[in-house]
Regions:
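Exposed beta-strand and adjacent loop surfaces of beta-rich binding modules
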Residues: 29, 62-69, 115-117, 133
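Secretory targeting signatures
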Residues: 1-32, 54
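Short glycine/proline/serine/threonine-rich loop/turn segments at secondary-structure transition edges
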Residues: 104-117
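Short beta-strand elements
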Residues: 127-140
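Contiguous segments within soluble domain cores/interaction surfaces
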Residues: 43-100, 123
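N-terminal edge beta-strand
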Residues: 26-47
Length: 140
């Protein structure tokens, strides 16, 4: 009886131990952080063509990553800025640039001059990896 238990234990160890010992270099811990969304004290004018830079730091190379920016929420709760793109993040720091035309008519878009949030989200395979935000002052 004791020999059968020892044999069963030995078989279990042989089956499960290799998965514990073998490491194929993937720790499973991927770190992605949004360092900044835009620059400090951004000011945009109605009708202006602007570039928004999102600075991202990644612990590893990641392909098929979606970065989305959204902001300038108007009186109707509509995001007047919404862009999304699929990129490859390099290990280290990346700067992703978005070009955007600010709406030309503030009453038409229900967008008044003022300070607005611009949010950035990084996701992969439906999982949100990082989020960040910045502010922009919208003037006439």
């Amino acid at each position: 009886m004791a020999g059968e238990k020892l044999l069963a234990f030995s078989v279990l160890v042989m089956v499960f131990l290799p998965g514990c010992i073998l490491d194929f270099g993937n720790s499973g811990a991927v770190s992605v952080k949004i360092i900044s969304v835009g620059e400090k004290d951004m000011v945009w004018h109605f009708g202006e063509r602007v570039t928004l830079n999102v600075t991202v730091k990644s612990s590893t190379l990641l392909d098929n990553v979606t970065i989305t920016i959204a902001g300038l929420k108007n009186e109707l709760n509509q995001m007047k800025l919404y862009k999304s793109t699929v990129i490859e993040l390099a290990k280290g720091t990346d700067i992703i640039s978005f070009s955007y035309s600010v709406p030309t008519c503030s009453p038409c878009n229900r967008l008044d001059p003022g300070v607005y949030y611009v949010n950035a989200t990084i996701s992969r395979n439906g999982e949100v990896l990082a989020e960040g935000s910045g502010t922009v002052k919208l003037v006439k």
